[in-house]
Every structure is written in structure tokens, then in C-alpha cells.
Amino acid sequence: MGGLSIWHWLIVLLIVALVFGTKKLRNIGNDLGSAVKGFKDGMKEGEAPADAQQLPRSGSVDVNAKETTRSDSNKA
């Protein structure tokens, strides 16, 4: 009894359609769809400059570098 069945949802949908009208609901659907599309486009635009702005690596790595510890530096 705690869950809503398909009949409950159909009755709620019918009441919403009667209160707002199908034209108003269609406009809300179009507005929501365009908002989602705009959000996705904005996310794509935000990703492109981040990839282009990667800084080139500079410097070199010494492959013969020796790892020193604190006790090694105290001995010298």
C-alpha cells in the first residue's frame, strides 16, 4: 500500500493535464529540452579550452640522480 501503482500515476497525470493544459505542458517540455541542450553545449565549450591550455613540459630528468635520505645528508 506504500507504493504508487500505474493507476495512481495516470490519475495524477490526467489531473495535471486538466489543470495546466496540454499546450502549456508541451511548452514546458520544450523549454526543459532546450535548457538541457544549452547545458550540454556549455559543458563541451568548457572542456575544449582546458585541453588547449596545457602547458608544455620544460626541464629535464636526471636519470643518474641518487636518492638521498636525511641520514645521508648528515654524514656529508
Curated annotation (Swiss-Prot):
Which InterPro entries has this protein been placed in?
TatA/B/E (IPR003369), TatA/E (IPR006312)
Q: Name one GO cellular component term.
A: TAT protein transport complex
**Residues spanning the membrane:** 1-21
Annotated membrane topology is:
Single-pass membrane protein
Any idea which UniProt keywords this protein has? Cell inner membrane, Cell membrane, Membrane, Protein transport, Translocation, Transmembrane, Transmembrane helix, Transport
What GO terms describe the biological role, i.e. biological process, of this protein? protein transport by the Tat complex
The Basic and acidic residues compositionally biased stretches are: 64-76
Q: Where is this region: Disordered?
A: 43-76
What molecular functions are annotated in GO for this chain? protein transmembrane transporter activity
Where is this chain primarily localised? membrane
Compartments, record wording: Cell inner membrane
Lineage top rank: taxon: Bacteria
Task of the protein: Part of the twin-arginine translocation (Tat) system that transports large folded proteins containing a characteristic twin-arginine motif in their signal peptide across membranes. TatA could form the protein-conducting channel of the Tat system.
Xref: HAMAP family = TatA_E (MF_00236)
Q: Spell out the family assignment given in the record's similarity comment.
A: Belongs to the TatA/E family.
Q: Which PANTHER family match?
A: SEC-INDEPENDENT PROTEIN TRANSLOCASE PROTEIN TATA
Q: How does it assemble?
A: The Tat system comprises two distinct complexes: a TatABC complex, containing multiple copies of TatA, TatB and TatC subunits, and a separate TatA complex, containing only TatA subunits. Substrates initially bind to the TatABC complex, which probably triggers association of the separate TatA complex to form the active translocon.
Name used for this protein in its record: Sec-independent protein translocase protein TatA
